Amino acid sequence: MIDKKQKQKIVSEFGKNESDTGSVGVQIALITGRIKYLTEHLKINKKDHSSKRGLLKLVGQRRSLLRYYQKKDLEAYRMLISKLGLRK
């Protein structure tokens, strides 16, 4: 899992201030960090089906948040995508 220091770093990088944990950009960045962690975990533990299900759930959650963010603020969406390196 992502530890507390990594979460604080993500929040300070993508949030408006240090305590801005609820904005869409921060939520997407945190979910992306969890997805990266679970992807590495599943490379080692191929038969961990519950983690795979959790990963798919997170991917769907991130997809819906990205769709919302794209409709709400296109410029911020494009900046977030480039910072996270999600789409090529």
From Swiss-Prot:
Q: Partners and quaternary state? A: Part of the 30S ribosomal subunit. Forms a bridge to the 50S subunit in the 70S ribosome, contacting the 23S rRNA.
SMART domains per UniProt: Ribosomal_S15
Instruction: Quote the InterPro entries the UniProt record gives.
Output: Ribosomal_uS15 (IPR000589), Ribosomal_uS15_bac-type (IPR005290), uS15_NS1_RNA-bd_sf (IPR009068)
Q: Which family does it belong to?
A: Belongs to the universal ribosomal protein uS15 family.
Which GO terms of the molecular function aspect are on file? rRNA binding; structural constituent of ribosome
Protease found in the keyword field:
no
Q: Which organism is it from?
A: Borreliella burgdorferi (strain ATCC 35210 / DSM 4680 / CIP 102532 / B31) (Borrelia burgdorferi)
Task: Give the encoding gene's name.
Answer: rpsO
**GO biological process, any:** translation
What keywords appear on the UniProt entry?
A: Ribonucleoprotein, Ribosomal protein, RNA-binding, rRNA-binding
Task: Return the protein name.
Answer: Small ribosomal subunit protein uS15
Q: Its function?
A: One of the primary rRNA binding proteins, it binds directly to 16S rRNA where it helps nucleate assembly of the platform of the 30S subunit by binding and bridging several RNA helices of the 16S rRNA. Forms an intersubunit bridge (bridge B4) with the 23S rRNA of the 50S subunit in the ribosome.
One term under GO cellular component: cytosolic small ribosomal subunit
Question: What Pfam families does the annotation carry?
Answer: Ribosomal_S15
